[in-house]
Amino acid sequence: MNCGPAFSISQSTFYIGVSSGNFTAGYLVAVNATTLAPILPHVHLIDPNTGQNATIPDDSSAAPTVGPDGDVYYGVFETACCSNHDRGWLLHFNSALTASKLPGAFGWDTTASVVAKAIVASYHGGSSYLLLTKYNNYKSTGGNGQNYVAITDPNTPMTDPVTGVSVMNVVMEQIGRTADGPPTGAVREWCINSSAIDPVTKSAIVNSEDGTNYRWDFTTNTLSQQMSLSPGVGEAYTPTVIGPDGTVYAINDAVLYAIGQ
């Protein structure tokens, strides 16, 4: 499988997903960062809609994310296509992996980005931080093709309109800019597995399948800047990164771009 580790707040533990093969069941495992000895218990990854095994595809690049409070988030695929429109689930656990918490409604091939509460002015809830993931709704697997990126509250529930499962509440969302109908309203999907968060400008840098790199401004909830990188092709989900000097790094059509002034 294709998964990187995430370290605990203390750096003494790292978390990683494991499976026995492509599209098989899997576990989230905690490991001693010094000795590499497994730390029990491991978590059996379960689809919150079916109550059965979630699956871990080899072509998913999802990696765990550790929140500032130590909670662990990991994206998985559904038990089988297409009970959640191939969106998967963002599973949510405490740091000891002994308690399952509120899941997110999108987890396929995504690594959640942590968003500081202070940079989302419109948020007045009780969580100390928020999460950003892509929130596509694939038209080829039962969805309406209205593909979003979303900021979610990891502790406040809403009812998922597709499955009826209680999931993380969507605080803010931004639909893709380039039409891709039919059906009417469908847009090109967001091609990211994680997003760079810019606390200085209170924004995120996100890649789209339309070949464009966008800045999503959290204050205005608009795509405030953009840079065309390619004509737009179906491609792998890739991350964006911001360097110490403010340069943005993004991959589009298998080319790494450095974007800056």
Predicted regions and their residues:
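Extracytoplasmic/lumenal domain signature
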Residues: M1-N2, A6-Q261
